[in-house]
């Protein structure tokens, strides 16, 4: 994430989830990563720009001292039930580390449209799903997930995204939201995942 390249972490060996959108085992892995990230006292490197978008000076700020209205970390999930668990996780992290109010937040992807944050940590919308459907494979929802962060993006998912997409039925249409009558969930998700650095953790 520190390089600015989006990263997908797939986690294998987890206990079964209660449902695709109620996955406490996966969120427990995510919470451990966030715990380490906050404890490491990372710094945020940036640039200031003039009114014409010309880069000015470089800045380096400890993440815990970052100022402004935007949160440093936004934890995003697709469905409301998953966000309820993410809210609880954010509350625990905030209390344990004495974080400023709003330093780390949780939200549904839909509610986070138009917002920005330093680092996005999101549960992939297809994680744990039996297959793509109109809701979890929507291109716009994935686009929001991938474009809210100014510095880094980490998607987490249960293992098996490639297999899920391989087994998804073909749908006629055009990929990546190009003009056409139907979007192609399988091709769209594959193209986007090809841009990610990928890692697998076995628990």
Predicted segments, located by residue:
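Amphipathic coiled-coil/heptad-repeat helices and related helical stalk/stem segments
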Residues: 26, 30, 105, 138-141
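Conserved nucleotide-binding/hydrolysis micro-motifs of P-loop NTPases
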Residues: 80-83, 112, 126-128, 150, ...
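Conserved helicase/translocase motor-coupling segment
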Residues: 1-91
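Conserved beta-strand segments of the P-loop GTPase G domain that flank and frequently precede/overlap
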Residues: 10, 76-78, 122-125, 155-157
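Helicase C-terminal subdomain and adjacent C-terminal extension
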Residues: 1, 94-96, 131-203
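Conserved RecA-like helicase motor-core motifs
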Residues: 74, 92-108
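A short beta-strand element within the Helicase C-terminal
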Residues: 107, 113-128, 143-144, 152-155
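Active-site lining segments that contact anionic ligands and/or coordinate catalytic metals
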Residues: 3-6, 70, 116-119, 150-151
């Amino acid at each position: 994430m520190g390089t600015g390249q989006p990263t997908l972490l797939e986690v294998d060996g987890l206990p079964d989830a209660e449902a695709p959108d109620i996955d406490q085992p996966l969120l427990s892995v995510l919470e451990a990563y966030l715990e380490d990230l906050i404890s490491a006292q990372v710094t945020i490197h940036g640039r200031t720009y003039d009114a014409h978008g010309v880069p000015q000076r470089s800045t380096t700020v400890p993440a815990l001292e970052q100022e402004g209205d935007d949160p440093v970390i936004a934890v995003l999930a697709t469905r409301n039930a998953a966000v309820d668990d993410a809210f609880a996780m954010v509350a625990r992290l905030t209390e344990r580390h004495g974080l400023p109010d709003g330093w780390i937040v949780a939200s549904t992807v839909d509610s986070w449209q138009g917002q920005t944050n330093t680092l996005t940590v999101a549960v992939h919308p297809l994680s744990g799903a039996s297959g793509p459907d109109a809701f979890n494979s929507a291109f716009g929802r994935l686009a929001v997930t991938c474009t809210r962060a100014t510095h880094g993006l980490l998607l987490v998912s249960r293992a098996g995204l490639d297999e899920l997409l391989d087994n998804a039925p073909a749908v006629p249409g055009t990929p990546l939201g190009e003009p056409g009558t139907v979007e192609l969930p399988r091709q769209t998700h594959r193209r986007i995942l090809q841009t990610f650095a990928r890692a697998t953790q076995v628990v």
